[in-house]
Curated annotation (Swiss-Prot):
One of its GO terms (cellular component) is plasma membrane-derived thylakoid lumen. The gene is petJ. Its main location: other. Keywords: Electron transport, Heme, Iron, Metal-binding, Photosynthesis, Signal, Thylakoid, Transport. SUPFAM superfamilies: Cytochrome c. It holds the Pfam family Cytochrome_CBB3. It comes from Thermostichus vulcanus. This is Cytochrome c6. Monomer. Belongs to the cytochrome c family. PetJ subfamily. Binds 1 heme c group covalently per subunit. It is found in: Cellular thylakoid lumen. Residues 1-25 form the signal peptide. InterPro entries: Cyt_c-like_dom, Cyt_c-like_dom_sf, Cyt_C6, Cyt_C_IC. NCBIfam families: Cytc6PetJCyano.
Amino acid sequence: MKKRFISVCAIAIALFVSLTPAALAADLANGAKVFSGNCAACHMGGGNVVMANKTLKKEALEQFGMYSEDAIIYQVQHGKNAMPAFAGRLTDEQIQDVAAYVLDQAAKGWAG
């Protein structure tokens, strides 16, 4: 009985791990599309045309406590200063996808 349970758990974990990259790629692709249509005017290439020191680069996100999906989601939903709130304009899924995209690009140095 115990061996069967362990086998079932191992299969479930293997399935989960094998499905994760495809799901992540789809989210990042959608995040890129959402970013391009809603964020790139001010944040092209991870920059910030309004507040030059508050970029979407990894170092700046870490410095300002924004290097997490939750922090970015909150910022996108609620806005701050010149940045508008997108909670009513974008779905929760779109906001989550754009947050994942921003973190992915920040980790890559916004190099593509």
